[in-house]
């Protein structure tokens, strides 16, 4: 696995070819207006500096510390908002998935929208989730858990690749 580079395009963003790109947006979708305002503002800045941009927002933040915390609008409304943003801005979108069932439901709800399914850090070792995401045929970003040694992330990536996905990447972060 070391030294092997796979590249692909998601919308106007090239991944794996050494080109810097930006993933940015609100942690969670609070409203369509708020998400669209942020998408437009970030898109202007990214365009001004010549950096390709993916809009990131989650329809559900399932790992909140408190059960009373706002989690988002849910999959159906969240997918509608992500679709509206993608269609209104031309941006590809990235959003978290938390269960194997959500992978297929979200993929169907977004239809032809350019989307990256992101596996949250806390779930980066969950085999069933990685396989389900791979089976959608969508691009996948596996976020590295802080509890995972950098070299151990190859196992998550291989689970995705061995399950039919050719469009995968990983986000790195600090290790404990």
Residue spans for each PLM region:
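Structural preference for beta-strand elements that scaffold enzyme active sites
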Residues: 19-23, 52-56, 92-94, 114-116, ...
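Conserved anion-binding
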Residues: 62-65, 112-115, 119-176
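Short histidine/acidic/glycine/proline-rich micro-motifs that form metal-
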Residues: 28-29, 176
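Acidic (Asp/Glu)-rich catalytic clusters
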Residues: 13-17, 43-50, 86-88, 107-112, ...
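N-terminal amphipathic alpha-helix/helix-capping segment at the start of soluble metabolic enzymes
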Residues: 1-22
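Short amphipathic alpha-helices and their capping/turn segments at secondary-structure boundaries
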Residues: 8-11, 35-50, 154, 158
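N-terminal active-site wall of soluble small-molecule enzyme domains
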Residues: 57-118, 126-129
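Glycine-rich anion/phosphate-binding loops
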Residues: 29-44, 73-80
